[in-house]
Design a protein with these regions (language model features):
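Class I SAM-dependent methyltransferase Rossmann-like catalytic core
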Residues: 15-68
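A short SAM/SAH-binding and catalytic strip from SAM-dependent methyltransferases
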Residues: 135-149
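A short, conserved alpha-helix within the catalytic core of class I
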Residues: 145-159, 166
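Conserved beta-strand signature within the Rossmann-like core of class I S-adenosyl-L-methionine
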Residues: 160-180
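Short alpha-helix
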Residues: 201-230
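Conserved class I S-adenosyl-L-methionine
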Residues: 68-79
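Short, glycine-/aromatic-enriched active-site segment of Class I SAM-dependent methyltransferases
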Residues: 174-205
């Protein structure tokens, strides 16, 4: 279990992280390259792994609207891997309107992933306006990457999509917020293997983990929590405190 370097604030964690952090040119370009390769691989051989079931479960919960595409706001969706999973599983006959909300660097780099059903936005309001009626807000593993997780969660809740699914997100059981620098390998970011021309190396970025109590309080302002997801009890640690990954399935 990796131990993150505890910090006093997001700003301190950002300063102690690798240059660029989540918007590092190397990190962003690798994630997009891996997503393009992932799309080609699934087109040639449609085989999904177990983690892909998170995306498929969210789609099943969203249902299928009549007479229009299924409309999904994918918060922190990287290079669009969740869309690729959905498109592979559902096929071209099931129309999708998918908006990924990401960093400006990712939105710019992910231009080759756009295909008429998938688009990228660095502004949540712009993504909402593009989608119109939102059937599902889907969030996988990005809330703890935000400088102010509670504020971003409040904005997601305020969209009032009929279904809200959170998965692979870091929470702490105790009160308050903890900040850290989290380390990983370049190869672990994005789906599939590294491009053969890219050497693996260490990367680091800020993490902000808020309490389950805070998360559930925000969710309950508009939603009923149907299910709590306990996915990984000790995904990593911060200053020796185990941090869990989990999520929620919510309905208006």
């Amino acid at each position: 279990m990796l131990d993150g370097l505890a910090c006093e604030s997001y700003e301190q964690a950002l300063a102690a992280s690798a240059k660029g952090a989540y918007e590092s040119a190397d990190l962003v370009s690798v994630i997009v390259a891996k997503n393009l390769a992932y799309r080609r691989a699934l087109s040639d051989r449609p085989v999904l792994d177990l983690p892909a079931l998170r995306t498929l479960a969210a789609l099943a919960i969203a249902g299928r609207p009549g007479g229009r595409p299924l409309s999904i706001l994918d918060f922190g969706g990287g290079g669009g891997s969740h869309y690729t999973i959905a498109r592979t599983a559902l096929g071209a006959s099931h129309p999708l309107k998918w908006a990924v909300v990401e960093t400006p660097a990712m939105v710019h780099a992910a231009a080759p992933m756009r295909d008429g059903s998938l688009d990228f936005f660095d502004d949540m309001d712009a993504a909402r306006d593009h989608l119109g009626q939102i059937d599902l807000v889907f969030h996988s593993g990005a809330l703890h990457c935000c400088p102010r997780p509670r504020s971003f969660l409040e904005r997601l809740v305020a969209l009032r999509a009929p279904r809200l699914v959170i998965t692979r997100t870091a929470f702490r059981d105790g009160p308050g917020t903890i900040y850290s620098v989290q380390k990983s390998r370049l190869s672990t970011n994005g789906p599939g293997p590294l491009p053969p021309t890219v050497a693996d190396r260490a990367v680091s970025y800020p993490n902000v983990v808020i309490s389950r109590q805070d998360v559930e309080g925000v969710l309950r302002t508009d939603y009923v929590i149907r299910v709590r997801l306990d996915e990984e009890a000790e995904a990593f640690s911060i200053g020796g405190e185990p941090i869990a990954l989990g999520g929620y399935i919510c309905a208006l």
